[in-house]
């Protein structure tokens, strides 16, 4: 329902809400940072390759600094020694930020059920999308990126998720 202004302006001006415009831009300009520690890190290279063309989703520029990234892809096993490093990388990312847990090891510890391995990175940082598999297919990772895009289109532009999440390192 318009205010009646649209009929007088014609096609020369488009009206929208600020949330919609900002979220549209965010959803098509995701800047991923891969935290690859095992086989899934190698599989992520296939996702970033030409065959799967991740650039059509606006995520082709892989960053190597957390301050330049807004999508963290954790691919592989995380040990308890690596947990504070992963937490620090997540905290250095600017808002809004999203996390994909890629592979069985990142999602649930994989077959490493021992005292040195974190049984899922959701014990450390909040996770937006889980991609199962050992290693997962590149199509599954692309599907997770598309779901992150949908989340980016619907989120409020003034949300801070760091303050509302408590992992085992915060205790």
Swiss-Prot record:
<dbReference type="GO" id="GO:0045271">
    <property type="term" value="C:respiratory chain complex I"/>
</dbReference>
<dbReference type="GO" id="GO:0048038">
    <property type="term" value="F:quinone binding"/>
</dbReference>
<feature type="binding site">
    <location>
        <position position="134"/>
    </location>
    <ligand>
        <name>[4Fe-4S] cluster</name>
    </ligand>
</feature>
<keyword id="KW-0997">Cell inner membrane</keyword>
<dbReference type="GO" id="GO:0051539">
    <property type="term" value="F:4 iron, 4 sulfur cluster binding"/>
</dbReference>
<keyword id="KW-0520">NAD</keyword>
<feature type="binding site">
    <location>
        <position position="105"/>
    </location>
    <ligand>
        <name>[4Fe-4S] cluster</name>
    </ligand>
</feature>
<dbReference type="InterPro" id="IPR006137">
    <property type="entry name" value="NADH_UbQ_OxRdtase-like_20kDa"/>
</dbReference>
<keyword id="KW-0004">4Fe-4S</keyword>
<protein>
    <recommendedName>
        <fullName>NADH-quinone oxidoreductase subunit B</fullName>
        <ecNumber>7.1.1.-</ecNumber>
    </recommendedName>
</protein>
<keyword id="KW-1278">Translocase</keyword>
<keyword id="KW-0472">Membrane</keyword>
<keyword id="KW-0830">Ubiquinone</keyword>
<keyword id="KW-0479">Metal-binding</keyword>
<comment type="similarity">
    <text>Belongs to the complex I 20 kDa subunit family.</text>
</comment>
<dbReference type="GO" id="GO:0015990">
    <property type="term" value="P:electron transport coupled proton transport"/>
</dbReference>
<keyword id="KW-0874">Quinone</keyword>
<keyword id="KW-1003">Cell membrane</keyword>
<dbReference type="Pfam" id="PF01058">
    <property type="entry name" value="Oxidored_q6"/>
</dbReference>
<dbReference type="GO" id="GO:0008137">
    <property type="term" value="F:NADH dehydrogenase (ubiquinone) activity"/>
</dbReference>
<comment type="function">
    <text>NDH-1 shuttles electrons from NADH, via FMN and iron-sulfur (Fe-S) centers, to quinones in the respiratory chain. The immediate electron acceptor for the enzyme in this species is believed to be ubiquinone. Couples the redox reaction to proton translocation (for every two electrons transferred, four hydrogen ions are translocated across the cytoplasmic membrane), and thus conserves the redox energy in a proton gradient.</text>
</comment>
<feature type="binding site">
    <location>
        <position position="40"/>
    </location>
    <ligand>
        <name>[4Fe-4S] cluster</name>
    </ligand>
</feature>
<dbReference type="GO" id="GO:0005886">
    <property type="term" value="C:plasma membrane"/>
</dbReference>
<dbReference type="GO" id="GO:0050136">
    <property type="term" value="F:NADH:ubiquinone reductase (non-electrogenic) activity"/>
</dbReference>
<keyword id="KW-0813">Transport</keyword>
<comment type="subunit">
    <text>NDH-1 is composed of 14 different subunits. Subunits NuoB, C, D, E, F, and G constitute the peripheral sector of the complex.</text>
</comment>
<dbReference type="InterPro" id="IPR006138">
    <property type="entry name" value="NADH_UQ_OxRdtase_20Kd_su"/>
</dbReference>
<dbReference type="GO" id="GO:0005506">
    <property type="term" value="F:iron ion binding"/>
</dbReference>
<feature type="binding site">
    <location>
        <position position="39"/>
    </location>
    <ligand>
        <name>[4Fe-4S] cluster</name>
    </ligand>
</feature>
<keyword id="KW-0408">Iron</keyword>
<keyword id="KW-0411">Iron-sulfur</keyword>
<dbReference type="GO" id="GO:0009060">
    <property type="term" value="P:aerobic respiration"/>
</dbReference>
């Amino acid at each position: 329902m318009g205010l009646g202004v649209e009929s007088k302006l014609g096609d020369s001006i488009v009206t929208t809400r600020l949330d919609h415009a900002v979220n549209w831009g965010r959803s098509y300009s995701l800047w991923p940072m891969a935290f690859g520690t095992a086989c899934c890190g190698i599989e992520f290279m296939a996702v970033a390759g030409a065959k799967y063309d991740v650039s059509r989703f606006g995520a082709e520029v892989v960053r190597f600094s957390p301050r330049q990234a807004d999508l963290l892809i954790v691919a592989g096993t995380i040990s308890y020694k690596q947990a504070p490093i992963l937490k620090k990388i997540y905290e250095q990312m600017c808002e809004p930020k999203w996390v994909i847990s890629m592979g069985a090891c990142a999602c649930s510890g994989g077959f490493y059920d021992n005292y040195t391995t974190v049984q899922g990175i959701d014990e450390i940082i909040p996770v937006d999308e889980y991609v199962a598999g050992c290693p997962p297919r590149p199509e599954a990772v692309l599907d997770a990126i598309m779901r992150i895009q949908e989340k980016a289109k619907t989120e409020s532009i003034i949300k801070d998720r760091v303050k509302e999440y408590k992992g085992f390192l915060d205790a």
